[in-house]
Amino acid sequence: MARTIGSNGEETAARIRACALELIASQGFEAMSMRGLAAAVGVQSAALYHHFATKQALLADLMMSHMRDLLTAWQTTFADHMEGHAAASDRLDAFARFHIRYHISRPQEVFIAYMELRSLSPVHYNAVSELRRDYENLLKAILQDGVDDGSFQIDDIHLTAMAILAMLTGITTWYRPGGRLSASAVEMQYAAMVRRMAVDDIGESLPVQKQAKQRPG
């Protein structure tokens, strides 16, 4: 049976995105050519432009899709945590575990989302950055709730949120399935570290750590 034009177009667009992810992750955005992408997809170069007007538009689509999917996945999977039915500490634990699980399952998307921000045009950069802020604000809201109810000791919500996200996302640079630690073990240990970051008063502990380093060995 012949495929409809619509379904064929959607399948082609999906193949373009999948091949673009592989090529950009392995070669870099600047090095990837639309001709090379067309060859990987198995279409003529002109066919690419029926789906994406420019190479820049394709990159923006990949990064916007990654952030939208991330936001949707959190809202769908952990809607009960978002609605305040759980304590802030439980929501923070759920957020940390979700972030790890989602990101290690999509290493190419994560790599491109962070390493190719510099390749976006100003308009696309601002659009992607707005979605990133939406996600960051989810974590900030959890941290603020914990401060308000007295369960967290945090001097700077923004700084702590950025530190947590950097630590959690950094897992994708070294984690590989089949390694020494399972995904569940990584989730558990990193969630515990995130919890300590929120519960401990990091601001007050820094001078103590500095003094400890100055002691003669």
Predicted features, each with a name:
Residues 59, 63, 67, 92, ...:
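Amphipathic, non-transmembrane alpha-helical scaffold segments
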Residues 110-114, 125, 129, 147-193, ...:
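Hydrophobic/aromatic-rich alpha-helical bundle segments in the mid-to-C-terminal region
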Residues 11-15, 19, 23-57, 61:
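Helix-turn-helix
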Residues 64, 89-104, 158, 162, ...:
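Amphipathic alpha-helical segments that line or abut small-molecule/effector binding pockets
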Residues 18, 64-93:
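Amphipathic alpha-helical linker/stalk segments
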Residues 101-140:
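Short secondary-structure transition hinges
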Residues 19-23, 98, 102, 167:
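Short amphipathic alpha-helical elements of helix-turn-helix/winged-helix folds
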